[in-house]
Amino acid sequence: MIEIRPWGTYEVLLDKPDHKVKEIYLKPNHRFSLQYHEHREEHWVIVEGSGTITQDDGEGTISPGEYAYIPRGTLHRLCGGENGIKLIEVQRGICDEDDIVRIEDDYGRLEK
């Protein structure tokens, strides 16, 4: 089932007790929250489009065929480029959708 979010869509391809695989589409010039996860790590493989990735204090461009590793506790964000970006995300650990600590959010989803 495809889940719709303000930034784009995702579909869970595999959901196991200790890992999850998603296909994610981030709309052009939209971005994830600046966030970190306490209980999981993420691995991103870019399959279409390009974007800007932020990890802790660094920022760079990421394109098809490139890979990013986001360790647990790492502050991160992805922004879709002018054509958006599609990626496969592999989560390892406790893969609960509530394990998101948002620092900044363009869509008003910061917890008060």
Where are these regions (language model features)?
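Double-stranded beta-helix
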Residues: 1-5, 77-112
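Short, surface-exposed charged micro-motifs
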Residues: 23, 43, 52, 67, ...
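Short acidic-glycine-tyrosine-enriched beta hairpin
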Residues: 56-75
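Glycine- and acidic-residue-biased ligand/ion/polar-headgroup-sensing regions
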Residues: 39-52, 56-57
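Short beta-strand segments
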Residues: 22, 32, 58-62, 99-101
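Well-ordered beta-strand positions
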Residues: 14, 25, 35, 45, ...
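A short glycine-rich, His/Asp/Glu-containing loop-to-beta-strand
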Residues: 1-36, 40-41, 90
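A generic "binding-loop/recognition-motif" signal
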Residues: 30, 39-40, 58, 74, ...
